[in-house]
A protein has these predicted regions:
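NAD(P)-dependent short-chain dehydrogenase/reductase
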Residues: 48, 63-136, 168
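Phosphate/diphosphate-binding loops
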Residues: 52-62
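Secondary-structure transition/capping motifs at alpha-helix termini
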Residues: 3-14, 65-72, 134-145, 172-176
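Short, flexible loop/turn elements at secondary-structure junctions
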Residues: 20-23, 77-82, 120-125, 154-157, ...
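Mid/C-terminal beta-alpha module of Rossmann-like enzyme folds, strongest
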Residues: 127, 131-211, 229-230, 253, ...
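Amphipathic terminal alpha-helices
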Residues: 217, 221-257
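Conserved Rossmann-fold NAD(P)-dependent oxidoreductase catalytic core, especially the SDR/UDP-sugar
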Residues: 1-52, 74, 81-87
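Residue-level signal for the nucleotide or nucleotide-sugar donor/cofactor binding architecture
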Residues: 53, 94, 119-122, 159, ...
Length: 257
């Protein structure tokens, strides 16, 4: 990270660091998790090290470089990336596609109290080009030299897992029963053959998340005003449920399932 920034400084270039939206989870204990600024968490030890490394180390290195050298250096906090809007292809070996595959392999999916904000990969790519100024953009140029700004590459249009996504999957042709989350984990564990049940490979991961009675996740609310002003592709959010995109995901997975 430091060598990359040093090279960018010598070449009078710019540096954009792709962080993760999960880094903002560290801000839950701060004044505002929605803030589009770099902050210093005082309770970071209570959260996972993976997020800590991004918010407290990598993100702050970028911020320090921008503040002390005058170079353009920005952090892009990127949310959950999904398949593209044209073909719907989404890597079937990722955790979410594997989870959804149990609709086909086991005939079940869990009922989750979760709010989601997925963003198609091609929209993410376009937004990065806009925010970085590679695609000419007066607003991103105007914000370029403000070292405190963090861009949230997020979808401001959210949807609900059980109320929105599961019906959309059924409308896309998948037939499955909806189980309480702990029962879904038990069903997942009941078929140990990874050829019949590829999702079993992530049993520990899903058991840790869902084999409990913890309340659902409402998700973080991100400050999007500055990001959307500099990225036309993100302005107003991207609709996933009512555009046929879920059906394209399922169609792209069908030959692989």
């Amino acid at each position: 990270m430091r060598s990359t920034l040093r090279k960018a400084q010598l070449q009078w270039s710019t540096s954009f660091f792709c962080s993760a939206a999960q880094a903002s989870a560290l801000s839950r204990a701060l004044a505002s998790p929605t803030s589009p600024n770099i902050s210093t968490p005082s309770l970071a030890g209570k959260f996972m090290r993976w997020c800590f490394s991004r918010l407290c180390i990598a993100e702050r290195i970028v911020h320090a470089a921008a503040r002390t050298t005058g170079m353009v250096a920005k952090v892009l906090r990127i949310g959950q990336i999904v398949g593209d809007t044209a073909t719907g292809y989404w890597n079937p070996t990722e955790a979410l596609p594997l989870m959804l595959q149990t609709a086909k392999t086991l005939g079940v999916l869990p009922a989750l109290d979760e709010t989601l904000a997925w963003l198609p990969v091609d929209v993410v790519a376009r937004s990065i080009l806009e925010l970085s100024g590679i695609v000419s953009n007066d607003r991103s140029k105007a914000l370029a030299h403000d070292p405190s700004i963090v861009y949230h590459v997020q979808n401001s249009k959210t949807f609900r897992w059980t109320e929105d996504l599961l019906p959309a999957l059924q409308q896309a042709g998948l037939k499955f029963d909806i189980l309480p989350k702990r029962e879904w984990v038990q069903r997942l564990e009941s078929e140990q053959d990874p050829k019949k049940n590829p999702t079993i490979k992530l049993l520990d991961f899903f058991a840790e998340k869902y084999d409990n009675d913890a309340p659902g996740r409402s998700g973080l609310t991100f400050a999007m005003e500055k990001t959307e002003s500099a990225s036309p592709s993100l302005k107003g959010g991207v609709e996933l449920i009512n555009t046929g995109l879920i059906k394209r995901f399922v169609a792209a997975w069908a030959p692989l399932w």
